[in-house]
Swiss-Prot record:
Keywords: Ribonucleoprotein, Ribosomal protein. GO terms for biological process: translation. Belongs to the universal ribosomal protein uS2 family. This is Small ribosomal subunit protein uS2. The keyword Ribosomal protein applies. Disulfide bonds: none annotated. InterPro entries: Ribosomal_uS2, Ribosomal_uS2_bac/mit/plastid, Ribosomal_uS2_CS, Ribosomal_uS2_flav_dom_sf. One of its GO terms (cellular component) is cytosolic small ribosomal subunit. NCBIfam families: rpsB_bact (TIGR01011). One of its GO terms (molecular function) is structural constituent of ribosome. Residues 228-259 are annotated as: Disordered. It comes from Thermosipho africanus (strain TCF52B). Residues 233-259 have a biased composition (Acidic residues).
Amino acid sequence: MAVLTMKQLLEAGVHFGHRTQRWNPKMKEYIFGARKGIYIIDLQKTSKLLDEAYNFVRDKAAEGGTILFVGTKKQAQQVIKQEAERCGAFYVNHRWLGGLLTNFETIRKRIDKLIELEEMEANGEFDHLPKKEQSRLRRILEKLRKNLGGLKNMTSLPDVIYIVDPRKERNAVYEANLLKIPTVAIVDTNCDPDEIDYIIPGNDDAIRAIQLITSKIADAYLEGREGVSFGSEEAEENNQKEDNEEIFEIEDVDESEEM
């Protein structure tokens, strides 16, 4: 049983890596070849490693563990928010605040401030304040919502962190590794796979690829929490035998959008 079929991975453009001038040699074993100056990721390995990541997240959730979704690049922001909210996970989709994990007690105080200001706004307390003070508090509230809105219910450190583009989210990766919090991540051809516990080799720039993989991580978390199977789709019989040369025949994805 495979979480995703080869066809789904191909159609989402998961196989498109970065240009050959931009790569990390540690990703060599996950690269099938190159096409028109673009690295092509080996989707057989992506499929296998995605299955492992799915099972890990599902099992952690079944044990009562929590997960934090992280993706602050433009292509990931909306997907991270939607999928995290769908499965009841925490998320950061705008800016990773330094010390979010390593100095969580201080961050938690800022989250409490966010909750306090939201309650004041909901109760109409802002309306009784001078306009200048109203404006100041609303600015603070907006900033806190943007940076910490996805963490309001996070009262302790998460048990797993899911990351889109660990190269961009290097601070999140550093803090997670320092605290020995397991990480799951979409790892493109320019990333260092050694920094991540459960890697998913794939395109971390295309919205469709990010959506496809992130939705499966969310499904895994839901399955573990609620005990409801989302049905790992059985790969087509020829998925195992499928020749990766088919990758080179896919023409319906605009590579310029993926890089």
